Amino acid sequence: VFPLSFAEFLRFNGILRNPPQGGFTAKEKGVLRRAAKDYLERGGFPDVQDVSDSMRVAMLQGYVDAVLYRDVLERHSVPSVQALKYTLDYLFHNYARKTSTRSISGVLKNLSVAANRESIADYLDWFKDAYLIYPVSVKSDSLAVKRVNPDKYYLIDTGLIRAMCVKNDLERGWLLENLVFMALRRGSNKIAYYLNGDGTEVDFHVFNKLARTSRLVQVSWDTADKATFAREFDALVAARKETGITDCTIVTWDDEGEKDGIRIVPVWKWLLAW
């Protein structure tokens, strides 16, 4: 069972069964904002929608355990169950960030957990095959560039992330980025992150394999943090210049506008297209 899309989440919960695609009333905007917050926090698995918060956490943790045992431990010869579990825990706490077998190996070593990099690479492949994680590589045709720029890993559901992490470890910007990735994954898209020549990054370079078109998507929680937003905006402008891609969007939590030909779209509106 895969998580619901935002549109499916709305229908499943009886919220704006036919949300407008154009203008929104103030009431509709309020409803969609609240729904987006619930979607981010609960996630999209149907079975956990109508239960208490504590029951939801228990069910989602049980889901991870079931996948771990059914899809990994029962199918593969695992050299260290402890290392396997610590690797998964690391991914739940470091999603949407560059992650390598070297970095995971270093963390495990500090925890006195033995695991070589080859085994960790196997664990990552098995988690991917079990649809728990999705790797995203740097946009490049060069194997050398890909070797020195590790993949980023996204989780299948933000509700799972919240269930597996203590509250103080949750960072809303990373959650929003994971939510945007999972929406992009639903299309016929090849997704990478884009590295500019100056070292700055754009979260997603998206190539639609059917339409043969490309777009750039940056995720920023809001525009209020001027320094952070300027850094993310400037990176997108640089990528637009380097790639020639004109379809550029910044997805925020609730800010909307346009700047220098770049759309700024709140996630509750952006998700309706996916």
Each PLM stretch: what is its role?
Residues 1-7:
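A short helix-turn-beta junction within AAA+ P-loop NTPase domains corresponding to the substrate/partner-engaging
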Residues 50-213:
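Accessory nucleic acid-recognition modules appended to NTPase machines
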Residues 12-21, 66-70:
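Conserved AAA+ ATPase "sensor/coupling" helix adjacent to the nucleotide-binding pocket
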Residues 22-63:
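Amphipathic alpha-helical "lid/sensor" segments that cap RecA-like P-loop NTPase cores
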Residues 244-252:
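Short, hydrophobic beta-strand segments that form beta-sheet elements in well-ordered domains
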Residues 222-242:
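Mg2+/Mn2+-dependent nuclease catalytic core
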Residues 253-274:
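Domain-level recognition of nuclease-like catalytic cores that cleave nucleotide substrates
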Residues 213-224:
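Active-site ExK catalytic segment of metal-dependent nucleases
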